[in-house]
């Protein structure tokens, strides 16, 4: 039976990490976490879930950090999660079923990311019921399709130091991608960090455009 690994990078995510790992531990054969410099108890929380924790030097490059974790994973299939995200039971079971079927003809699966927020003016914002447990008090969400489940192939790699994605390499190497948008990853920390986070991403983006001044994608990101 194919094995499923959950792969993550974290830094000071103690506020969110336990809920994330609780939502995936029942379906994961391994959990590999790259820590990029936590000073809180993120590592201790991860250890409680028997995660394999590795220190990953931070180089202002999200793709490099994620690829270091991919290289350490041994499972046939990998599920990328962020610490402020969870799966509900139906989504978790659907992912496990796909892995047990070895992708059912696919090499990568695109799921739906629900970014919970109260900004009703945001493009594609959708309201939710006040008693929706996944919303955790938020009025609605913004849905974005993302590739999060994929075969563990060395040629499948993340690219771009910020707004990193693996889709480009999967397509480049002939991988079959299938959309399974009924599987929802619930993103609870959307918008966290405020101005400090925006400045952090801007610094990385500036470095990218300076290194590739003639690359339109670098400027777009």
Predicted regions mapped to residue ranges:
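N-proximal low-complexity "stem/linker" segments adjacent to membrane-targeting elements
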Residues: 1-23
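Short, well-ordered alpha-helix to beta-strand connector turns
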Residues: 28, 50, 73-75, 106
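Catalytic-site signature of metal-activated, phosphate-bearing donor transferases
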Residues: 2, 63-70, 81, 87-221
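Conserved donor nucleotide-binding strand/loop of the catalytic core
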Residues: 43-68, 72
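Short aromatic/hydrophobic "clamp" motif used to bind/position activated sugar donors
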Residues: 78
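A conserved acidic beta->alpha catalytic loop
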Residues: 23, 27, 35-47, 58, ...
